[in-house]
Regions:
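Short, charged, surface-exposed interaction patches
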Residues: 40-71, 110-130
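Small/polar-rich, solvent-exposed N-terminal microdomains that initiate assembly or binding
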Residues: 1-64, 85, 148-153
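Residue-level marker of positions within ordered structural domains that often coincide
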Residues: 18, 55, 82, 99, ...
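Oligomerization/assembly interface segments of phage tail-like spikes and tubes
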Residues: 67-85, 129-141
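Extracellular/virion structural assembly segments
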Residues: 82-99
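Acidic-leaning, charged glycine-interspersed low-complexity segments
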Residues: 96-153
Length: 153
């Protein structure tokens, strides 16, 4: 079964030695792994949270009878660190790790980047910490036949 975008990002970041040298894998969280909300409040800096954002099926109109095999999917990566420079370093390291990981994937499983943006470094006085959120929008191929076979099995 093909992985979702947030799962790909989680695997990429937890398996990259440059990322885990800065942020231990135990402080890289994802929506595909249950994390009690209160645990995030006490997590030492730096940490990363990968989010599974809403997506849109790539069909011509909403009146079509069948879904397309291609979906436009989105995921976010929140970076929290003690200084703006630490956020910038992590942002560069994360982007490089994701690019390398995606390039190593097979063509059928590889997400195709559609757009990338970030919110900019901001201060959270409640933590306190600096943070930035990266937003990725990608096209991914999810064969509908595979979904039907999985539901039948």
């Amino acid at each position: 079964m093909q992985k979702e975008l947030d799962e790909i990002f989680y695997d990429a970041l937890t398996n990259d030695s440059n990322v885990t040298a800065i942020v231990p894998a135990t402080r890289i969280f994802s929506t595909c792994i249950e994390v009690p909300p209160m645990e995030n409040d006490n997590t030492p800096l730096p940490y990363i949270i990968i989010t599974d954002d809403p997506f849109q099926d790539e069909q011509a109109t909403k009146d079509e009878l069948w879904e397309s095999d291609w979906d436009t999917v989105q995921a976010g990566i929140e970076i929290a660190a003690a200084s703006p420079n630490a956020v910038k370093q992590l942002r560069r390291t994360i982007r490089h790790a994701l690019a390398q990981y995606v390039e190593s994937m097979s063509d059928n499983e590889r997400p195709v980047l559609r757009s990338f943006s970030n919110e900019g470094i901001a201060w959270d006085w409640t933590k306190p910490c600096y943070y930035d959120t990266l937003h990725y929008q990608c096209d991914m191929y999810f064969p509908i036949d595979d979904d039907n076979e999985q539901n039948e099995g």
